[in-house]
Amino acid sequence: MFKQILGKLPKKTSAKFWDNGESQTLDNNNNQGGGDEVLSQRTSSNGDTSLDCVSSFDVLPRLRDVSISEKQELFLKKLRLCCLVFDFVAEPQQNFKEKEIKRQTLLEVVDYVISSGNGKFPESVIQEATKMISANLFSNPHRQWKNKTPEALDLEEEEGSLNPSWPHLQIVYEFLLRIVASPNTDPKISKKYIDHTFVLKLLDLFDSEDPREREYLKTILHRIYGRFMVHRPFIRKTMNNILYDFIFETGKHSGIAEFLEVLGSIINGFALPLKEEHKLFLTRVLIPLHKLKCLPNYHQQLSYCVIQFVEKDCKLADTVIRGMLKYWPVTNSAKEIMFLNELEEILEATQLTEFERCMVPLSRQIAQCLSSSHFQVAERALYLWNNDHVTNLVRQNSRIILPIVFPALEKNGSSHWNQAVKNLTENVLKVLSDTNPDLFEECLHKFQEDQQKAEDTKKKNGETWRQLEEIVASMAK
């Protein structure tokens, strides 16, 4: 990724920097970098690094052009320079040269982190690095762009807006990723600066509409969770709170899929037996996430998290299946197919004992899916019988399950409008007939009796209505 960023750089930049619209030309005689100079900002006494507070600039050499003893101090100066934040939203056409100089400086500090030796970064480096990262990632100018989206725009139908500050932000994210992942970063020192406040602000950025930004954040959060064990409970708790707010309050958040992808890795690392707090997370967060209408945006990641729980503790299968039945979509066929896909994967990890606890309500729901006029829903439900494990669970409980699903299958075979559904239904009926012929005949006989009773009742009701109509007609005369 870093090589791709480097490849986009122009070979040379101008040595002119603008300060509030007034140009300052550098004296090339003072250039210590052989034409590749970088500018150092002088800030106000209160440390403000906004563009309005910059008064003058000094020429800085390249890191590769100074001695080893000077590199660290020069690196710190470059980090301070990179704290200067440009407004790409309000002033997109201004300060081109300055923006490019900062971009090159950012690339240089990233390269310094990558190529640094085996020595640990001192506290001063970590402190200045987190200051620079905070100034760029958490600054208002970089966040104003997301409010530019018209209110009438349906965000669920859009791929997301792209952050205009990305030429700088991308490299800052790369720098943060390299710092966090570097073996030269000591977590014991870094946790003082990459603290709860820093992590909380980082998690808030997941609501960015830019998918490139969310992808970086996902990778960085993975690294922070892996290296900073002291922050793990806080990260899980904060993610829970964000998901609670999404489920029960707002219903809108751009980074749910990325959150769940990180959580999938976290769940995968849970030790057995599962803690009660982890089981509560399943029942209070993951299962209710199925009810939102934007489920397609994150269903793949959600399904993975849920299945991880069932694979770790098969006793949770009953809880998960009943939870899914509670939120089963009624009028959304696309979501119904997603539920059936997830259900099959859950059943794959379900043992017989847990299956028997929920098989009656589950069979009723599957029967409704079999009866669906939407052919894809009916097809997906029929495909469950292609799964050997599911078929085995059904076979061992055929006395209870077959009477529930048989009417739907028989009606499909005779009256469904879609020929593919009819063909699949015939195959399933043949499998059920071969598995338990006697029970199959019983179900068929009962179905025919019920059909005859329904027909007789219909005729009787029709005759009753006819007599009532005659009585009313005679009274009218």
Curated annotation (Swiss-Prot):
Protein name: Serine/threonine protein phosphatase 2A 55 kDa regulatory subunit B' delta isoform
Disulfide bonds: none
Subcellular location as annotated: Cytoplasm
InterPro entries associated with the record: ARM-like, ARM-type_fold, PP2A_B56
Tissue: Expressed ubiquitously.
A Pfam short name: B56
Function, as annotated: The B regulatory subunit may modulate substrate selectivity and catalytic activity, and may also direct the localization of the catalytic enzyme to a particular subcellular compartment.
SUPFAM superfamilies (alphabetical): ARM repeat
An annotated Gene Ontology molecular function: protein phosphatase regulator activity
Self-association state and partner proteins as the record states: PP2A consists of a common heteromeric enzyme, composed of a catalytic subunit (subunits C), a constant regulatory subunit (subunit A), and a variety of regulatory subunits such as subunits B (the R2/B/PR55/B55, R3/B''/PR72/PR130/PR59 and R5/B'/B56 families). Interacts with SRK2E/OST1.
Keywords in alphabetical order: Cytoplasm
Any one biological process term the GO annotation gives: signal transduction
Induction profile: Induced by epibrassinolide.
Domain of life: Eukaryota
GO cellular component: cytoplasm; nucleolus; protein phosphatase type 2A complex
Annotated family: Belongs to the phosphatase 2A regulatory subunit B56 family.
Matches recorded under Gene3D superfamilies: Leucine-rich Repeat Variant (1.25.10.10)
Keyword Plastid part of the UniProt annotation: no
